[in-house]
Amino acid sequence: MSERYPIIAITGSSGAGTTSVTRTFENIFRREGVKSVVIEGDSFHRYDRAEMKVKMAEAERTGNMNFSHFGEENNLFGELENLFRSYAETGTGMHRHYLHSPEEAAPFGQEPGTFTQWEPLPADTDLLFYEGLHGGVVTDSVNVAQYPNLLIGVVPVINLEWIQKLWRDKKQRGYSTEAVTDTILRRMPDYVNYICPQFSRTHVNFQRVPCVDTSNPFISREIPAPDESMVVIRFANPKGIDFQYLLSMIHDSFMSRANTIVVPGGKMELAMQLIFTPFVLRMMERRKRAAQ
């Protein structure tokens, strides 16, 4: 961890809701005048969309039915660790973008599903903000989790996570239920081995729990609304967290354990604002002292 060049990382599976958390942080950064550089985890996949289809077909022909974006084989873990290390030491590093859609690809004159060229990070940023699958990953050869000053896990209960992924991939990307289900099944070993362990390394976890029946996520026609859920917020180290303040500010919240507060689903963004604004301000104070 670096006080002069801090890193915030949001880690969560596909469909977990990390994008909405990123929007909350963008609001905090804008309000507090923090200049951040945002890194999307997709940009550290090893293969672009077309290459991934070819590699997946090759893997299936050899009997590997679990070839996925979640595992080490298909990601540039070493390059991600190098970026975090370089930024923590010098405030610099190399990054690129993954172009998901025609709208994102058009300014670069490229096809969707491709990567831009590697380029240096912008100069004079206050912090690096990562959102993706592997912000807290640790393997035999890399340790990404050691660098973030603040590591946040976004992990709905599994059925809700699947409902969110099914809805997004069907509505926004045009996939069938069968295709999304195949993806979920194919990713399961890597989900267990690479995604889940990260949530034991995070500083804070947000777990949305539905209060409606999600027993069979594959037939759900809609995502449970925020008001139909609760959010369990767990702090790895509760020292310094003003739980009484949070309880007074968030209506219908309560403590379930000494390090855990539960809030209504519709209050998740408010909870994040109340919890993380002081974190960010303290980071900026330490950064100023370290630069002197």
Swiss-Prot record:
Enzyme Commission identifier(s): 2.7.1.19
InterPro entries the UniProt entry points to: P-loop_NTPase, PRK, PRK/URK
Pathway: Carbohydrate biosynthesis; Calvin cycle
Gene Ontology BP, a term: reductive pentose-phosphate cycle
Catalytic activity: D-ribulose 5-phosphate + ATP = D-ribulose 1,5-bisphosphate + ADP + H(+)
Highest rank taxon of the organism: Bacteria
Residues the record lists as binding ATP: G12, S13, S14, G15, A16, G17, T18, T19, S20
Pfam entry (one): PRK
Keywords from the named record: ATP-binding, Calvin cycle, Kinase, Nucleotide-binding, Transferase
Family as reported in the entry's similarity comment: Belongs to the phosphoribulokinase family.
Subunit structure: Homooctamer.
NCBIfam families the record matches: PRK15453.1
Protein name: Phosphoribulokinase, chromosomal
Taxonomic lineage: Bacteria, Pseudomonadati, Pseudomonadota, Betaproteobacteria, Burkholderiales
